[in-house]
């Protein structure tokens, strides 16, 4: 309108278009997650890595939370894990059957460390570091014929896949340990088609009659 002479001023002068945040990691597809985690362990630490990665994806942990997990963090025979997240807030999370199985396999073959309660240990019997696991995952993803994957992508995939199947944003907020729902909304960027599908399948007044 301003360009064509209908207005004597530009109403959008000084307005800057908001930047789109592309800094969030991309979620892997369920097929890519299966491809990544389908590797057959050949060494002791392959078993550890499989348990670690299965736990990340199963429970949506931050890498810092996962490396801090102890045997005493689990309850009900590895069915739930207690973690301490940001702000020193504790939360209890379910552990999936694949993660539970992988953890038990790791415990069966690992060498006992000086601190028997530490779950994920290195070759010196010490707690592993986030940097070490990032490097291990990077190499594993390339070995599996994939683009580089980092631990946070598994957490992001956990949230995205759970939201796509359930649509329960509030529960996912609790599981991720987000203090604000807006953080979870940004974190789990679903497209409009996915949101419409969830709405159609879940809302009482949106369900189609047979």
Annotate each language-model stretch with its function.
Residues 1-210:
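Conserved catalytic core of the tyrosine transesterase superfamily
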């Amino acid at each position: 309108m301003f360009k064509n002479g209908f207005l004597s001023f530009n109403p959008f002068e000084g307005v800057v278009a908001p930047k789109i945040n592309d800094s969030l990691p991309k979620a892997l597809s369920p097929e890519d997650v299966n491809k990544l985690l389908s590797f057959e362990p050949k060494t002791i630490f392959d078993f550890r890595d499989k348990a670690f990665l299965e736990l990340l994806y199963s429970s949506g942990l931050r890498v810092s939370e996962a490396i801090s997990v102890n045997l005493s963090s689990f309850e009900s025979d590895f069915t739930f894990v207690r973690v301490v997240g940001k702000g020193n807030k504790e939360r209890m999370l379910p552990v999936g059957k694949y993660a539970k199985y992988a953890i038990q396999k790791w415990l069966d073959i690992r060498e006992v460390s000086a601190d028997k309660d530490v779950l994920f240990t290195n070759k010196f019997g010490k707690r592993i570091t986030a940097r070490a696991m990032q490097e291990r995952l990077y190499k594993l993803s390339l070995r599996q014929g994939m683009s580089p994957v980092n631990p946070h992508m598994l957490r992001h995939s956990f949230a995205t896949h759970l939201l796509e199947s359930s649509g329960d944003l509030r529960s996912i907020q609790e599981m991720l340990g987000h203090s604000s729902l807006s953080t979870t909304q940004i974190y789990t960027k679903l497209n409009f088609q996915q949101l419409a599908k969830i709405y159609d399948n879940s809302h009482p007044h949106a369900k189609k009659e047979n």
